[in-house]
Regions:
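Strongly charged
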Residues: 1-50, 57-146
């Protein structure tokens, strides 16, 4: 199950409540992913590990050469820049780039059901069960005397 927490925000001068997704515990490690993949394929965990370790460099090489990277069943990765603005087109160029990030877009499939079109994004199942995450309080532990 996935977790959400309640958050209070100000909107148009009034307090409103909403929720945001939160994670719990440590992220799933590369080693754990390799074991899951090896258990469900014919590849060994060490082969999967070597492949996953090579993936970022191969993706970087292709993206720095102007290509996006699409992983079937997962989605597409591409560079996204934030840049300063100038008044004249002649001044616009690489020197305006302040930050470069990787933009990820989950793969999308569209299915026609009668007259409706249903869009589904990779990595987002239809049946996520959400539970409110109650952060443990940071109060001091008390000991019982017997």
């Amino acid at each position: 199950m996935a977790f959400i927490k309640k958050i209070k925000r100000k909107w148009q001068g009034r307090e409103k409540w909403s929720v945001t997704a939160v994670t719990q515990g440590n992220p799933v490690s590369t080693k754990e992913l390799c074991e899951y993949i090896a258990d469900s394929t014919t590849a060994s965990a060490s082969d999967v590990y070597a492949t996953l370790l090579a993936l970022p460099k191969i993706m970087e090489l292709n993206m720095k050469n102007g290509r996006s990277v699409k992983l079937e069943g997962i989605g597409t990765f591409r560079y996204k820049v934030s840049a300063a603005m100038v008044d004249k087109e002649a001044e616009a160029g690489e020197s305006l780039i302040r930050d470069v990030r990787v933009q990820f877009t989950p793969e999308r499939t569209v299915t026609a059901v009668g007259k409706r079109r249903i869009t589904r994004r990779a990595l987002i199942p239809d049946n996520i069960k959400w539970e409110i995450y109650d952060k443990p309080s940071k109060s001091k532990k008390t000991t019982e005397e017997g």
